Amino acid sequence: MVNAVMDAIALLSSLASDLDIMLNDLRSAPSHAATATATATTTATVATATATTTANRQQQHHNHHNQQQMQSRQLHAHHWQSINNNKNNNISNKNNNNNNNNNNNINNNNNNNNHSAHPPCLIDIKLKSSRSAATKITHTTTANQLQQQQRRRVAPKPLPRPPRRTRPTGQKEVGPSEEDGDTDASDLANMTSPLSASAAATRINGLSPEVKKVQRLPLWNARNGNGSTTTHCHPTGVSVQRRLPIQSHQQRILNQRFHHQRMHHGTSEPIPSGVATPSSLDSASVDGGKSHTGNNNNINNNHNGQQSQKSQQQAGLAAKLNVLAQSNLNNNNTTNQPGSMTPASNRTGLDSNQNQKQNLNADSRRSSSVDPDADADDVVDAAHGGAFEDDMQALLPKCSRRSRDELSQSRTSLVSSSEGGILAEGETSSEDDEEEPVEAEDEGEESSRDSSDNSPPCDLGLMERLLVTHPMWFLPGIQRSGAVHLLQGKEEGTFIVRGSSQPNTMAVSVRLPQDTGPYIEHYLIQSHDNVLSLESSRFTFGSIPSLIAHYAQCCDELPVQLMLPRVLREANNRKKLSSLALLGQEFWSYVSSPALLGPLTPSVAPSKDQQLLDAKSPLSLTETSGLGTATFFSDTVSKPPPTGAPPLPGGGLFSPTGSGQLLGFFSQAGTPSDTTNSSLSSFTTSGGQHMQLLSPNSVDSVILTMSPVDNPGHYLPGSTGAPMAPLCPSVVDQQLSTFKVAQTAPEVDQVRPQRPKPPNTLNLKPPAPPLRWSKPHSPDQNGSANGNFTVTTTVTFSMENGGGGGSGPTVGNGNGKFVEVTTPAASNPFNALLNGQASTFQTFAKRLSPEGECKDTLSSQGSSSNDSRWPPPARKLLTSPMTPLTPSGGSSSSGGKSRKSRAGKESQHYKESDILESPPMQYCASALSDKISDYEDVWSHDPSDRASLLTSFRPALDTVGGVMNRRPDLLAETPSTPTPTQQSHLTPCEEETTATPNESSSQSLLQFSGDVPARSRAGLLLPNLSGQVPPVAMTKSMTAAEDDGGDTTPTAEGQANGASRSKQGSPFYAEPADALRQAGLTSAATAILRRQHRSQMLHASQRHSEPLKAGFGGSGNGAMLQPSDLEKLAGSLDELKPKPKVSQQQQQSQQQQQPTKRARNRIDHWQLDSSWEFMAKQDTGSHAGGDYDTAAIDWQEKENSLGRDSRADGQGKKRTLTIHQIIANRLPDLNLPELVRCSTPPQTAALQPHVLGQDKAGVGCDGSQKSFQSQIGCRLSSYDNVFCQNSFGGIDSAQSDDGTIFSEPWDSSQWDTFLPHDDATINSDTIHLSKCRPALSEDDTIVEELQSTKDGSNGSCNQDTLKANRNGAGHHKLNNGNGNGKANNRPKVATILRNPSMRDREVLCHPRNKMSIQSSGPGDSLRAYTLQLAQDPSSTFARNIENFICCTKESREAAPQVVMRNMRQFMSGMKNYLVKHGEGKFHAELETARARLKSDEFLNLDAMLETVMHQLVVLPLREHLYGIFVDHYQRSEDIQLLAQNVRYACEREAADFGIRPTVTPPSQAALRLIANLLWRLQEAELPLDKLELFLCVISTVFDATGCPRGQQLGADDFLPVLVYVVAKCGFVGAEIEAEFMWGLLQPTLLNGEPGYYLTALCSAVQVLKTFMASEGESGSGSLDWRSSCLPACSSVLRVIIPDECNGSLQTRTLPVRPHTTTREVCRIIAHKARITNPQDYALFKLVDGEETLLTDAECPQDARLAAKGKHCMLAYKRIDAKIAWPTAQLAGH
């Protein structure tokens, strides 16, 4: 029989390749097949077997019957031992070929009795597979072999195991027993064939081959001793015997019961091995490979008859069996027999030995090394001898086994506990675990902390510390932006080694100190021949840790020494470091840096009933992990319930899966089943009450779970010792905070700084951020009258040193700057949870930057959408920590430092949303506007302030019919009506606000500590705000002084600090509400600055928005026409949008709205403007009278919402920086004046009559035109038509009938007199009135071109037709009065302000620019949708824009031309993407727009999308690009050179600029107007706006020269004039502005006039740079423009153009930019010379009459200079033309 067994072994060894097919069938085999079926199968497959097989089957039936009888019997420990010893002897006997007769007898006895009770499915399949392989097998297998193989399927088919971290608690004992069965089948496959082991594990367990490859093969191959799997192994002997430790159903019940009882006891006694140590049973099943002790044999014989049922049952085993099994394992490892199965036995013993250690370490919960889900690190540890198997492997040297063991053991323990419960962190190392198991998590905080702190301190070297902690700082999977996120707010010198986009390189990102470089710098690590070094460094290293260690010890090449975070530096033992290393990347978001936490403060001394159970302090960092946070209870506070006691009601743990269903109830010691890979945030309350906040993988939010405590009264943080109502039905307003409340000051002496909980970075949606302005309420409010449980805690940790009374808890010294806020979205969350509803609790975790600014861990829109509509009874008033307190308030909640000092610490970076803490889809679920400052520092406004657009100093508004009844969703978190309970939470200042009964129901006031309406990174106004922004939203920045940093509000004490504070203590100067709503021209801060420049002649009591009183006309107006008054005349063409004439009745209605207002204002100032009522109606005051038609209203609102408002309001924190200001700031040595108008004298009085008259004429026609005074305030208001008619006329509105209610609509006599009646009145002094509509007097080329364009596009010269086209509506025409006819008769009437002629407007309404103006046409909806799409972060369009802006700002590219080229390419690419592929509903909107087009119209998508892309891309990068420009030209010293020459040229006369006497230079008045236009050009933000204004400048220059219409003013004359204008106006930023437009405008837009005049500007700048040198070289004191030897010729080209019609040569002077190519020059010439076939022409170089064709890429200037000294000319002629050039030199050549 034994020989037959060995023959079968030989046969099976030769069939290793066939076993892969057998195992494929194995997976599909039924695991619970009936015995009869299995028997039939066996009969069919072993037809050739002997009678012994039949007897075995009969015996199998008998054994199965016996097993059913014995399932309820619990065996004693010695039974189990005898089984193990017997099986060990079995192995020995078979391995040693019956060397011992005693063993042989035992083996024979086993043949009769030791049968398996389960169907022989496995052996049947294997035999059937063998036959299918066409191999004849004589089944002489003995009954023992059959039964041993059948025993492999003794257990039912194991259920698929859940993921390791999500297995329910109830299965945590069943799982290990089942997985052994799974693993054993894999063992079989691995022992049989090394190639099929992975597949076998996969087929049996359902896991991916990749997982098995990582977790199993390296371990097994390494542990076979020779590095390869033994190929002669077979599925008998050892592999069969190892199948023993399968638990029966009874044993599983026993395990669960014991585990449940153990959990309730909360003890550290080990579970009996027979119950919970399957790995030890595995060990026992294989030890004794060569055991011949008589004791074992006797025990086997005594219990031989009972072994047939022991393959499934496990009984209680004494703890000493573990020691015995361990000794047997050790003995087995040293007992090898040649020529036997001992190598496999030894391998198994090693596995079991490893299992024994890990099982003890994991608290007897699982067998890790043979478990399919064993931690890969354990496998790696065993396979590679402790080397790291991760991204470090190629870079790190082999490290010590000891430290890796601790790391792997600690990680194994933590992973194990995350399945069956969160362990206390204090796992002992592998050396200690052999003696005692780890304590469970319910041992209490102190016991668990002791377990981690008991490790003796040791001296850890830097290299060892780096190696152990490498999972934190070595993050090759992240890129630049991720590293920047992680290092925000960390210590100087903190670093992260990350991946790099360049091949064979990595990068180390370092947080640099101030004044040493950027906030975070990145240094490349290069690898050459396996040698590492920093880029361009002379130091080389063999590994990254050695490189880091070097730069951590010296500061040779880096500006700062590298260092680990403080927590890692101060860890004094390996155990703590290893535990911290488990956090990996989450460490950075998990642990606050010392820069934020400040010095560690001693722990809070717990009171009798108030234990500070804080698992988040830096002193206990190792008690938490990214896999789950361990939270503890103090035994002194709450005792565990009695053994076996059912869970208390209300202590249920609720599912965080989003469905809200109950998973079950657990006792206090129970830990949540972490079914969604969630991380636990913990709130430890003062009464020992434990609250866990699970961050679920659901859309909504955090589920609030509470574990019950013994005492029925639960102590809440807000309570002072009085027990509260029972937990579930409790109706309380409580503060959930990680801080201990300050009311317990007598009990709590000191507070330890807190540590925030990190959201899991895998599947979790991080908690939403809190409102930054919210502050804690008065803590004495523990109950409310309503029936809702509202946990609306808004806890702000004070950053100041002092604490204020009555302002909420003040913790410590203010160093712990972390806030966690829990807010509800359901009225009764606990009842909702118990009823299975999804609750929407949110945990707001906020991080503080080094400067003290709060940063949200996720955007505020990442929170649940359900919380956007809180029921008013469930709300608690969210008060503002910045709320100003009156002097009677007694104390300030912020205490300590002044607001100015705090504002100085404002961080501009990374206001919210750590990308690494958010899964991609969840991160993109929030709006684009929520990611305002992820990558940039342009806007300092905190995104959480978006929800508070009302300032705290605003008097309460009546919400009935008010604006708050229609407030947008972004204001949804604003409580609309504070209840009496809520009022008790107000700070003293707020209590004053709501003191009266009438105000008790008014709108609560929120602090708007950022700026006026928030703008996203793309510069967009937040949705729903443009038409609904309460007007007070702007008063903050209007009334705060500039030096306050835009982050403070004026207080009563500080209101006398400057004129920018509100008048008489009020922030309101009664600016019209509609002007505030549509403040789209400039920011409110600009308006404040301009207000300081108001005329000194005005009386102090004169309100800014009030019409001037009588007596201020005449000469007084001269003072009002100052540069500061004129500089903001109109924002753009859109701001001067034509509107219809206002009828007298409508004007009357407007006038009648303010009679009392006007009278009262003569006496005092309003505290609140009555015009707010129009804001409440979402209308302007004039809309109530209906004076504007619907299209005009729609246009204005849409324009404000889509771009104009956003471009201005987004700058709410500061004025738009101009290039002039940037240069003045960067180069203070230049001493540039604030407004460079050094040579402009005051405006003459002779100009004023025309100015005033024409302004009033424009008003008479339109009734809504802004006056100079109104534009000083930078606003568009319906009230402007009231006083702009008399602001400059000096007539009081009460006495005037000019355009007022006394005028009849048909009576034009009142305003006819102001219209000019002949062209003589049109001179250069009146051009400024047109601003964006200047008269055009250019050369005939442009005039004729524009005329043809006009005729072709509009069909007539009727200006109203064009206006209707611009407005996209046909009803925007003026009434057919005298004014209209006169306007048509005189194309250049002064009313071009509203009704410019075709000729006068066309240069600005260039076809390329019209679509940018025509925003109310068919393409308006498409434009609006595109902007909306850019705010949807889930769209590819928005994400690409965001990423591009981020990369551009982080790039170190120093060449502005390269940056602009990238921006231009990106904008073009995104336009193509939208048009070709579309996204969202773009194509649907496009089809809708197409349907609105007429048959002869088309929609210029390119122009429309161009304006959109400018807003989305150029606007956010504007100042960044300007900074690059200034740096670039500063390095080249071009700015200094230009400023020096401008200062010199400013004093020169017109003749010195080479202006011929026949050309009249611009007058001083014209220069003044041009200077204002140039200033407005610099303030314009977008290239198209700048281009419009620049064309205005050019047109104004032409008219200012007085050239008769149609007269040619060529480049020879125009360039000197332009140089003169630039010098006189001090336009130092001319070159940068020209380059800005050149680089960012679409190239096709620069064809024709825009490109020509931009080139002229560049040429003028080049001339100015060499002005002094050229003047000196000329010898005449003036520039000679026709001299070819002057340096100025580098910017001017003189080109000969032969006229083949008459045989003459024409000479043209062309302005050129430096290094202009031939192709560009040819394009300019073709345009100027009206060449219709430019492809037939080319530019030639004539040197001594010899023609040389210049290629397109050549530079004509260089070619000419290269021929200097010779007679060289440039000729533009037809390529095929044969021309004999004259030998006489032309003039000027």
From Swiss-Prot:
Biased composition (Basic and acidic residues): 903-914
Chain intervals for the UniProt region annotation (Disordered): 53-120, 140-190, 218-237, 261-317, 329-378, 401-460, 632-689, 744-787, 852-918, 969-1006, 1040-1067, 1094-1123, 1138-1160
GO molecular function: GTPase activator activity; guanyl-nucleotide exchange factor activity; protein kinase binding; receptor tyrosine kinase binding; small GTPase binding
Biased composition (Low complexity): 82-114, 295-317, 409-418, 671-686, 974-984, 1143-1154
Tissue: In late cellular blastoderm embryos, it is expressed in the posterior end. Then, as development proceeds, it is expressed in the developing midgut, amnioserosa and in a specific subset of CNS neurons. Isoform 1 is expressed earlier in developing midgut and amnioserosa, but is not expressed in the CNS.
Matching InterPro entries: RA_dom, SH2, SH2_dom_sf, VPS9, Vps9-like, VPS9_dom_sf
Gene3D superfamilies: SH2 domain, VPS9 domain
PROSITE patterns per record: RA, SH2, VPS9
Biased composition (Pro residues): 639-649
GO cellular component terms listed in the entry, alphabetical order: cell cortex; cytosol; endocytic vesicle
Domain SH2 intervals: 473-566
Key words of the record: Developmental protein, GTPase activation, SH2 domain
Span of domain VPS9: 1531-1673
Entry superkingdom: Eukaryota
Bias-annotated ranges (Acidic residues): 176-185, 428-445
Limits of the Ras-associating domain: 1689-1777
Biased composition annotated in UniProt, kind: Polar residues: 140-149, 223-233, 337-361, 857-868, 994-1006, 1048-1065
GO BP annotation list: axon extension; positive regulation of border follicle cell migration; positive regulation of receptor-mediated endocytosis; regulation of Rab protein signal transduction; signal transduction; vesicle-mediated transport
CDD domains (UniProt xref): RA_Rin
Family affiliation: Belongs to the RIN (Ras interaction/interference) family.
Purpose of the protein: Potential Ras effector protein. May function as a guanine nucleotide exchange (GEF), by exchanging bound GDP for free GTP.
Listed PANTHER family: PROTEIN SPRINT, RAB GDP/GTP EXCHANGE FACTOR
Protein name as annotated: Protein sprint
Species per Swiss-Prot/TrEMBL record: Drosophila melanogaster
Upper lineage: Eukaryota, Metazoa, Ecdysozoa, Arthropoda, Hexapoda
